[in-house]
Swiss-Prot record:
Similarity comment text for this entry: Belongs to the intermediate filament family.
Record protein name field: Keratin, type I cytoskeletal 18
Region entry Linker 1, spans: 120-136
Entry keywords, A to Z: Coiled coil, Intermediate filament, Keratin, Phosphoprotein
Gene name, Swiss-Prot/TrEMBL: krt18
Role of this protein: When phosphorylated, plays a role in filament reorganization.
Residue span, IF rod domain: 84-395
Residues with PTM Phosphoserine: 12, 22, 36
Tissue specificity as recorded in UniProt: Expressed in simple epithelia such as intestinal mucosa, bile duct, hepatocytes, renal tubules, endothelia, ocular lens epithelium, and in a variety of mesenchymally-derived cells such as blood vessel endothelia, pillar gill cells, optic nerve glial cells, fibroblasts, interstitial cells, chondrocytes and ovarian theca cells. Also expressed in epidermis, pharyngeal mucosa, mucosa of anterior esophagus, gill mucosa and cornea.
Region (Linker 12): 229-252
Length: 431
């Protein structure tokens, strides 16, 4: 890594009142150079002394330093000299502090590189060990299981609350209908009471009218009696009649009065009895209607209770039906899977059986061929034996015997690779 730092200093002294001094530092690569600048009087004899130093750039992100410093001054030559000295001193101080920081950073960088090298040597090749995450995974699985259980419990509670709300709504509707029925009954009873009060008022008005009529009749009777008495007292004629003595007029009037009083009393008693009988009849009707209403109300309540019980039982039966249907679906699915597995096994066994049958048929054919060869060889051996024995032998017999071949067919039944039954069939044919 190359290190290079260049400094350029320009100084001009003339009679021009404005003088410019510029100091530039350009860092191209991470190489550091410490420099001190000394200026002569009036800006003449300016020189730069520099010392190079290594830059610091570690893998930890310490950036390389690059700076550009420019100092400009204007004024007379004395002012320029004073400003240059102050600027140079300031720059020297800043460069010294930068060098100290660089040295500290280099030491820290070397220490970090050493630690990194040691850590890499100790750690060796990268091996992914996830065993330390297993407890966390187990805990998270447990939390997920608990959350799922709580969710199911909450769903069950929500369903129970919904059923309870439905039950309360049914009860509320039944109570509301009962209340409406009672209000309708109360309205009807109020109408009956109003009709009864109206009848009572009519009867009372009739009683008052009869009383007034009775008073009016009594008054007319008294007036007629008084008029008759006045006429009798004013008339001076005495008439003697040879007739039996008539009844006393006052006695007749008393009798008439008593008769009318009895009639009025009788009418009053009859009216009172009729009124009481009407009231009693109305009360009996009201009592009967009330009892009938109470009976009908109790019957309605009982029917509503039965309806609620039947509705609850219906809901439970529906839930039971749903659970049984779900169980039936699961059972059918499981049985279908088992049937598919069994069908697969059956197909495999059928394929194996077909293969075994083919193998048996092939072996049977080979056995028949070997048996034919054996029989031919036995026939030839027998013929050769006859020839060797020197017995009676004809060429025609040998030819005929050679043309006859016995065929033996062996049939075996295999179950699970074992021979269950075996049968042998022998046939003789001519070649």
């Amino acid at each position: 890594m190359s290190l290079r730092t260049s400094y350029s200093v320009r100084s001009s002294t003339s009679q021009v009142p404005v003088s410019q001094v510029s100091i530039k530092r350009t860092t191209n690569v991470p190489t550091y150079r410490a420099a001190s600048i000394y200026g002569g009087a009036g800006g003449q004899g300016t020189r730069i002394s520099s010392a190079s130093y290594s830059g610091v750039r570690s893998g930890l992100g310490v950036p390389s330093m690059s700076s550009s410093i420019q100092v400009s001054a204007s004024g007379s030559t004395g002012e320029i000299m004073g400003n240059e000295k102050m600027a140079m001193q300031n720059l020297n101080d800043r460069l010294a502090s930068y060098l100290e920081k660089v040295r500290i950073l280099e030491q820290a960088n070397s220490k970090l590189e050493l630690k990194i090298r040691e850590a890499l040597e100790k750690r060796g090749p990268d091996v992914h060990d996830y065993s330390r995450f297993q407890p966390i995974v187990d805990e998270l699985r447990k939390k997920i299981f608990d959350a799922t259980t709580n969710n199911a419990r909450l769903v069950l509670q929500i369903d129970n609350a919904r059923l309870a709300a439905d039950d309360f709504r049914v009860k509320y509707e039944s109570e509301l209908s009962i209340r409406q029925g009672v209000e309708a009954d109360i309205t009807g009873l109020r109408k009956v009471i109003d009709d009864t009060n109206l009848n009572r008022m009519n009867l009372e008005s009739e009683i008052e009218a009869l009383k007034e009529e009775l008073i009016f009749l009594k008054k007319n009777h008294d007036n007629e009696v008084m008029e008759l008495r006045n006429q009798i007292s004013q008339s001076g004629v005495q008439v003697d009649v040879d007739a039996p003595k008539g009844q006393d007029l006052s006695q007749i009037m008393e009798e008439i009065r008593a008769k009318y009083e009895k009639m009025a009393l009788k009418n009053q008693e009859e009216l009172k009895a009729w009124h009481e009988s009407q009231i009693t009849e109305v009360q009996v009707q009201v009592t009967q209607n009330t009892e009938a209403l109470q009976g009908a109300r109790s019957e309605v309540n009982e029917l509503r209770r039965q309806i609620q019980t039947l509705e609850i039982e219906l809901e439970s039966q529906k839930n039971l039906k749903g659970s049984l249907e779900g169980t039936l679906r699961d059972t059918e699915m499981r049985y279908n899977m088992e049937i598919e597995n069994l069908n697969t096994i059956i197909l495999q066994l059928e394929a194996e059986l077909t293969q075994l049958r083919g193998n048996i048929q092939h072996q049977t054919q080979e056995y028949e061929a070997l048996l034919n060869i054996k029989m031919k060889l036995e026939a030839e051996i027998a013929t050769y034996r006859r020839l060797l024995d020197g017995g009676d032998f004809k060429l025609q017999d040998a030819l005929e015997e050679q043309k006859k071949v016995k065929v033996m067919t062996v049939t075996q039944t295999l179950v699970d690779g074992k021979v269950v039954s075996s049968s042998t069939e022998t046939k003789e044919r001519k070649l």
